[in-house]
Amino acid sequence: MTNAFNTSNSQAVFHAAQELMPGGVSSPVRAFKSVNGDPIVFDRVKGAYAWDLDGNRFIDYVGSWGPAICGHSHPEVIASLQEALEKGTSFGAPCELENKLAEMVIEAVPSVEMVRFVNSGTEACMAVLRLMRAFTGRDKLIKFEGCYHGHADMFLVKAGSGVATLGLPDSPGVPRSTTSNTLTAPYNDLEAVKNLFAENPDAIAGVILEPIVGNAGFIQPEPGFLEGLRELTKENGSLLVFDEVMTGFRISYGGAQGRFGVTPDLTTMGKVIGGGLPVGAYGGRKDIMSMVAPAGPMYQAGTLSGNPLAMTAGIKTLEILQQEGTYERLASITNRLINGICESAKQAGIPITGSSISGMFGFYLCEGPVRNFEEAKQTNSDYFGKLHRAMLAKGVYLAPSAFEAGFTSLAHSEEDIDSTLKAFNECFNELSQ
């Protein structure tokens, strides 16, 4: 990065964008409102780095919000895409590459016997909710406070992430009738889930959750929580759905369910399985997935679903992740990163709690533990905003929200971690004075 931290080109482009797009962005968190600043406008990305329009280089811990697990613009992924481009960008017809990626997903993810590709995580979660209801003949859904399952109406109830980032209540424009069948419970609270089942006998189609909450920061399941949900759903004739859009192929090759040894009935996926291109997927037990059209009566479709570019990038990304030592390396650098962040904060007298699993991490600027969204909201968001801006000036790009997980990649080097920890140490000391 340059000696003087200049973002004038980013500011000019963002100013112009505000006349063209709502808030100047295509997704709210990118506007930097949570950190009280103007966004950085990127020009290019490569490996562990991003460059803005002013030539500043940043060590990137957002990774396009999770997909860039191999690093940005991985040469093998780019080469595969260039070859695929010669054959066309979209067929709107069956594509042999769909078979290949489907086989890889089915082999890797314990719950998945059949899979359907879509274009986003939101789309996957919308479809899986319809499928839950179709299969069970029930209407109600249990979700957890702070878990985000996309921006579809029925999920915008205590949804964390973007809603928490903007400090807004659940979105206007969502009819009460749409969310009346959405029940909520605190994350890690099995007793609350038991009570909801007791209060709604034979009415709950299923329970959906992020097995690790990445859209309220980084909250891990307490021992027995996922296992308890598996038992409760079976006992009540309901389905268990893991939203692994963020954790799938990220915390282990088999996702959170592979890591924790708890197999849901259905799983939603995205991010990593598209290798940086727009993608989503949902899959699960064959008897449930057989209800999806055209095999069954539950309708779901998509113009660009299973397009050859997304399939190509996904296949190559998963092939890279299959290489020996991949997840051990991610765990090593990420563990060193979060431990160093927490140590620097504590030495500066700043309350902090943080943790990581594989290439995913998060921290809260408050005393721990943080087990649910209410406890996550105790984080010092004002301080985080100052920290975020200070880290940008030192060449480190963190998620512009205190309520988003961070990500490392195979491209991050030990030197990158060293530089990042040096910047954190300097920023904590400067801000504590």
Curated annotation (Swiss-Prot):
<keyword id="KW-0663">Pyridoxal phosphate</keyword>
<dbReference type="InterPro" id="IPR015422">
    <property type="entry name" value="PyrdxlP-dep_Trfase_small"/>
</dbReference>
<dbReference type="GO" id="GO:0005737">
    <property type="term" value="C:cytoplasm"/>
</dbReference>
<dbReference type="Pfam" id="PF00202">
    <property type="entry name" value="Aminotran_3"/>
</dbReference>
<protein>
    <recommendedName>
        <fullName>Glutamate-1-semialdehyde 2,1-aminomutase</fullName>
        <ecNumber>5.4.3.8</ecNumber>
    </recommendedName>
</protein>
<keyword id="KW-0413">Isomerase</keyword>
<dbReference type="InterPro" id="IPR015421">
    <property type="entry name" value="PyrdxlP-dep_Trfase_major"/>
</dbReference>
<keyword id="KW-0963">Cytoplasm</keyword>
<comment type="similarity">
    <text>Belongs to the class-III pyridoxal-phosphate-dependent aminotransferase family. HemL subfamily.</text>
</comment>
<dbReference type="GO" id="GO:0015995">
    <property type="term" value="P:chlorophyll biosynthetic process"/>
</dbReference>
<comment type="pathway">
    <text>Porphyrin-containing compound metabolism; chlorophyll biosynthesis.</text>
</comment>
<dbReference type="InterPro" id="IPR004639">
    <property type="entry name" value="4pyrrol_synth_GluAld_NH2Trfase"/>
</dbReference>
<keyword id="KW-0627">Porphyrin biosynthesis</keyword>
<comment type="subunit">
    <text>Homodimer.</text>
</comment>
<dbReference type="InterPro" id="IPR015424">
    <property type="entry name" value="PyrdxlP-dep_Trfase"/>
</dbReference>
<dbReference type="InterPro" id="IPR005814">
    <property type="entry name" value="Aminotrans_3"/>
</dbReference>
<dbReference type="GO" id="GO:0030170">
    <property type="term" value="F:pyridoxal phosphate binding"/>
</dbReference>
<dbReference type="GO" id="GO:0008483">
    <property type="term" value="F:transaminase activity"/>
</dbReference>
<comment type="pathway">
    <text>Porphyrin-containing compound metabolism; protoporphyrin-IX biosynthesis; 5-aminolevulinate from L-glutamyl-tRNA(Glu): step 2/2.</text>
</comment>
<dbReference type="GO" id="GO:0006782">
    <property type="term" value="P:protoporphyrinogen IX biosynthetic process"/>
</dbReference>
<dbReference type="GO" id="GO:0042286">
    <property type="term" value="F:glutamate-1-semialdehyde 2,1-aminomutase activity"/>
</dbReference>
<feature type="modified residue" description="N6-(pyridoxal phosphate)lysine">
    <location>
        <position position="271"/>
    </location>
</feature>
<dbReference type="InterPro" id="IPR049704">
    <property type="entry name" value="Aminotrans_3_PPA_site"/>
</dbReference>
<keyword id="KW-0149">Chlorophyll biosynthesis</keyword>
